[in-house]
Amino acid sequence: MKREQLYSGKAKTIYATDNPDTLIAEFRNSLTAFNGEKKGEMEKKGYYNAQISKKIFEMLEASGIKTHFVSMLSDIEMLVKKVEIIKIEVIVRNIAAGSITKKYPMKEGTIFESPVLVFDFKSDEYGDPMLNDDIAVALGIATREELATLRKLALRINELLVPYLDEKGILLPDFKLEFGRRDGEIILSDEISCDTCRFWDKKTGQSMDKDVFRFDKGDISKAYEEVARRIVPEIFE
C-alpha cells in the first residue's frame, strides 16, 4: 500500500498510497524544538504520539468532529484522508504558558476566563508569524468564512478535550491544531499529541509534553509514556 515518500516534516513522514484519496502518516522518534534548532531522538516517541492521536481522533469523531483519521496500519503508521492543508496553525490557550507570557504582561499559570484563540501563518521561512483575518485573506490562505469555521471548530474541540483530559488528571494549557479542505468541507488534520499540546499533571503542575525536551525539565520518555498510560492504557496491557 505504501508508495513514494511525499514529504518529511519535523516529526512525521507522509507517503502516497495506491488510493489517491488517502495518505500514510508515519510517526517518527525525532524530537525538535525552537523551529528545528534543537534536535533529539526518543525511543517509542512515534508510537506514543500515534496512539494518543488515534484515541483522541476517535473521541472527537464520536462527538461529531470530522477528522482525517481513517485507521492504523501499524503501531506508528496512520492511514489518513488526503486534504488540502490550510497554512494556518490554530492555537487555543486556556492557561497562560510559553510564548504568550513573554510577548504580553501575563503570568504563567493564569487561567483565562474564556479560551484565547490565535492564528499563526504556518511557515518556517517566516517564523510562523501571528495572523489576523485581513492578513490571512490578503495572503489567500483562507476566506473569512473559512476563518470563522476554523474558530468554531477549534473552540468546539477545546470544549471536548478539556473535560476528556481532566478526567485523566491532565490539564490542557494550550494546543495547536491544523485543518485541511476536503470535498468542500474543513476537517481536522495533523495530530493531537504530546508534540502539539501542553499537558500538565493536574496534581503537580509538571509538564508532560515537549516542553520537557525543550527546556530540559527531566526525562522526556517518562513524560510521553505517562500521558500515553492515561489516554491509551490499553496499549500497556
Swiss-Prot record:
What superkingdom heads the lineage? Archaea
Task: Write out the pathway annotation from the protein's UniProt entry.
Answer: Purine metabolism; IMP biosynthesis via de novo pathway; 5-amino-1-(5-phospho-D-ribosyl)imidazole-4-carboxamide from 5-amino-1-(5-phospho-D-ribosyl)imidazole-4-carboxylate: step 1/2
Family stated for the protein in its record: Belongs to the SAICAR synthetase family.
EC number(s) reported in the record: 6.3.2.6
Q: Which named protein is this? A: Phosphoribosylaminoimidazole-succinocarboxamide synthase
Q: Which SUPFAM superfamilies match?
A: SAICAR synthase-like
Record keywords, A-Z: ATP-binding, Ligase, Nucleotide-binding, Purine biosynthesis
InterPro entries from the UniProt entry = SAICAR_synt/ADE2_N (IPR028923), SAICAR_synt_PurC (IPR033934), SAICAR_synth (IPR001636), SAICAR_synthetase (IPR050089), SAICAR_synthetase_CS (IPR018236)
